[in-house]
Each structure stands twice: as structure tokens, then as C-alpha cells.
Design a protein with these regions (language model features):
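Bacterial N-terminal signal peptides
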Residues: 5-17
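Conserved C-terminal helix/tail region of periplasmic/extracytoplasmic solute-binding proteins
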Residues: 22, 330-365
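Short, polar/charged alpha-helical segment
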Residues: 23-34, 38-64
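Sec-exported extracytoplasmic/periplasmic mature domains
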Residues: 31-38, 58-63, 80-84, 98, ...
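Extracytoplasmic ligand-binding site segments that recognize negatively charged/polar headgroups
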Residues: 40-54, 66-80, 88-227, 231
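A ligand-binding cleft/hinge motif common to bilobed small-molecule-binding domains
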Residues: 99-102, 237-257
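Periplasmic-binding protein-like
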Residues: 209-213, 218-220, 253-281, 322-323
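Mature extracytoplasmic/periplasmic domains
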Residues: 273-340
Length: 365
């Protein structure tokens, strides 16, 4: 008993309390997690996130965190295979839209709300739009969507070849002037190109996309290749490559600039902003500790800075992201506009994103 009390006191001294009203409960979770001494999380394929998250979490809690950085489908498929085989390795997963829905539907995830130990995390008033679920049709409890942004992977132009006033509407992209001069991130695979393509599919229809394809688009899954072509004036306009791809060219003074949003708007996204806890995690207290830290104000500030993404937390500043070509939905959109422009979350993913991607498969050969 004395050892447990000593451990709780040590955790209280070691861990800065995330919420002053509940130090005892959170300290118990942290103490139990420290006894497990490990948590395993599947994360997006970002070397920066893996390196900085390892240092931040281990440095704060003194607990080893194994981070498996890989494309979302790779981690999700591995979890599904292991769950079916009775293997318990992963504790939690962070992915983009749609990726983990089969896990939710297959009973392979834990409900999120019972694991929200911190009041600042549980309280929907701290979140723009309240609690938003990726699995928002039937279950509404397994996958929490903590990012909402607009503009990521948007529209860029070469300022020696195009002018913003020539591209005020999506219809302007059908001008014969741009034939053979536009690049698109491949909409047949998940990503920013698919998001833009899906918005066009929903707002403008399939005839519009047929005409767009007739513009002899340069379609690639290599965003760096698309950005390089724009910087070298091989393309005049690109769709789907983002600020991170263009930053080196901007710093070199090359003529690449982001287009203002067309009058129809740009798609709202939750980026790599969906978190779930795996069913019967091997380190249940570590999983709960990680979830609460990630969704806390501190965790959301950390994740946003590393990933250049926009949290939905109302107490975290996101206006600085405009310099990186991203705008937080909470800073720029009403909830009605957000729901009009988004093609993520299960309802839009199944009725817009998937059929739009299937149409892309048909007409992009």
C-alpha cells in the first residue's frame, strides 16, 4: 500500500496536472499507466511526429511509447488482422477519414467517451461543433474527430503563367487556356486530391469532372513531383499539393503562390485527425492516458504545431496556420458551411467520397 501511495505522489509531482479539479483521478490513471510502462500507438507517416511525440510523451510521463508511423490503411489492416487472430499489440490509432471505419463497424474499438477522464476533454463546450464523431451514422462513439480545417492541399498557381482573377470559380478551370497545364493529386487514392475531386463531384457534378479530365490533367500520387512541375513552369495550376510541398520553392523565391478559394469554396477536412482506442488494449491505462493527453489543450497545441493542423478546441490558437496555407474551420466557417464543404466523416465519406473516387477510377485511365 505504501508503495502505491508513494507512486501516486511521485506521479503528482512528476506530471503537471492537466486539470486542477481532478488531480487525484488523473494521477491514478498516470500511476497505473506507469506500472504498465508502455503504450503502442499507430500514427500517420510523419518522421517529425514520431520523433517529437516520443520525446514529449516519454518526457512528460516517464512511460515508453512505441509509435508505428505508417499510412493509415496499413496500421488499420494490421490491427484488424491481429484482432481476428487474438493478438493484442496496438493500444490506439490516429488516422484520416474513412480509414478506421471498418474497425469501428467490426467491433474492434473501445468507446471513446468512457475513456475521457479529464473534464476539459469531456466537456463539449471546449470543442468547436461539440463532440464530432467520424463514425457519425450508427455508432457515434468509437472514432473521435479532433481536427477541422479548410485549405489544406488546395489550389496553387505559377504567377508567371496565371493570375488569380482568371481563376475565381471552379468553372474557370475548364478554360481551354489551361489544357495540359494543370496538375492534380491522384483522386483515386485517399488524400487532398481526392478531397478536392469529391467536392467538385458533389457541387458541380460528373459532367464537370469529365470536362476537367479533358483538360489533359497531369495526375500523380507524388505531391513533390506536382509541386516541382509548377515551380519549373511546366504547369500553371495545381490541385491537391499543399504548403509543405511548396515551402522549399517559396523559400527559393520561385513563382509559386496559393490561389484564393474559388467562389464555391474549398473542402473542409479533418486531416490526420481521427483517434480511436483498440478493443481490449494491452495497456489500457496507457491508452487512456494517451487519449486524454492528446485531446487536452496541451496535447492539441503540440499536435497542431507538429502536424500544421487545426484543432477544434476553442482554447487553442490556430490563426497562425494561415501562414502554412491552412485555416481552422473554427476561425473561418460556420457549422453550416463546414457541413456543406466537408466530405469527411462517415455520412459524407460513404455518400460523396467513395462514389467520387469510384468515378475517378472509371474516367482516369
Amino acid at each position: 500500500v505504501r508503495q502505491v501511495v508513494t507512486l501516486v505522489i511521485a506521479i503528482l509531482l512528476f506530471v503537471p496536472v492537466l486539470h486542477a479539479a481532478e488531480p487525484a483521478d488523473f494521477a491514478k490513471i498516470a500511476a497505473a499507466a506507469k506500472q504498465e510502462n508502455k503504450v503502442v500507438v499507430g500514427i500517420p507517416p510523419s518522421a517529425d511526429l514520431r520523433k517529437q511525440l516520443d520525446a514529449a510523451f516519454k518526457g512528460k510521463f516517464g512511460i515508453d511509447i512505441e509509435l508505428l508511423a505508417a499510412p493509415g490503411p496499413q496500421n488499420a489492416n494490421r490491427i484488424a488482422s491481429e484482432q481476428k487472430a487474438g493478438v493484442r499489440y496496438f493500444d490506439a490509432i490516429i488516422v484520416g477519414t474513412g480509414t478506421a471505419l471498418p474497425l469501428a463497424h467490426g467491433g474492434m474499438l473501445e468507446p471513446i467517451e468512457p475513456n475521457m477522464a479529464l473534464a476539459e476533454v469531456r466537456d463539449p463546450k471546449n470543442w468547436w461543433g461539440g463532440h464530432i464523431w467520424e463514425d457519425n451514422l450508427k455508432t457515434k462513439r468509437f472514432l473521435y474527430s479532433f481536427i477541422a480545417e479548410v485549405g489544406t492541399g488546395g489550389l496553387w498557381y505559377n504567377s508567371t503563367l496565371a493570375k488569380p482573377e482568371e481563376l475565381r470559380s471552379l468553372d474557370d478551370f475548364l478554360n481551354p487556356k489551361w489544357k495540359g497545364k494543370m496538375g492534380l493529386s491522384d483522386p483515386r487514392v485517399p488524400g487532398s486530391g481526392q478531397s478536392l475531386w469529391s467536392l467538385c463531384w458533389e457541387l458541380k457534378g460528373e459532367d464537370y469532372l469529365r470536362k476537367l479530365v479533358q483538360q489533359n490533367l497531369f495526375v500523380s500520387r507524388d505531391l513533390r513531383q506536382i509541386a516541382d512541375a509548377l515551380a519549373k513552369s511546366k504547369l500553371a495550376i495545381t490541385m491537391g499539393a499543399g504548403h509543405s510541398q511548396y515551402e522549399p520553392f517559396i523559400n527559393s523565391g520561385l513563382p509559386v503562390k496559393q490561389l484564393p478559394a474559388p467562389k464555391e469554396g474549398l473542402p473542409a477536412s479533418n486531416g490526420y485527425g481521427v483517434v480511436g482506442i483498440v478493443k481490449n488494449p494491452p495497456h489500457p491505462n496507457g491508452a487512456k492516458l494517451f487519449l486524454n493527453w492528446l485531446l487536452s489543450r496541451e496535447g492539441q497545441e503540440f499536435y497542431g504545431k507538429v502536424m500544421k493542423s487545426s484543432t477544434r478546441r476553442l482554447d487553442v490558437d490556430t490563426k497562425w496556420l494561415i501562414a502554412y496555407g491552412t485555416q481552422a474551420a473554427k476561425d473561418t466557417l460556420t457549422l453550416d458551411d463546414y457541413n456543406r464543404l466537408r466530405n469527411h466523416l462517415e455520412d459524407k465519406y460513404t455518400t460523396v467520397r467513395l462514389p467520387a473516387a469510384e468515378f475517378a477510377e472509371q474516367i482516369l485511365k
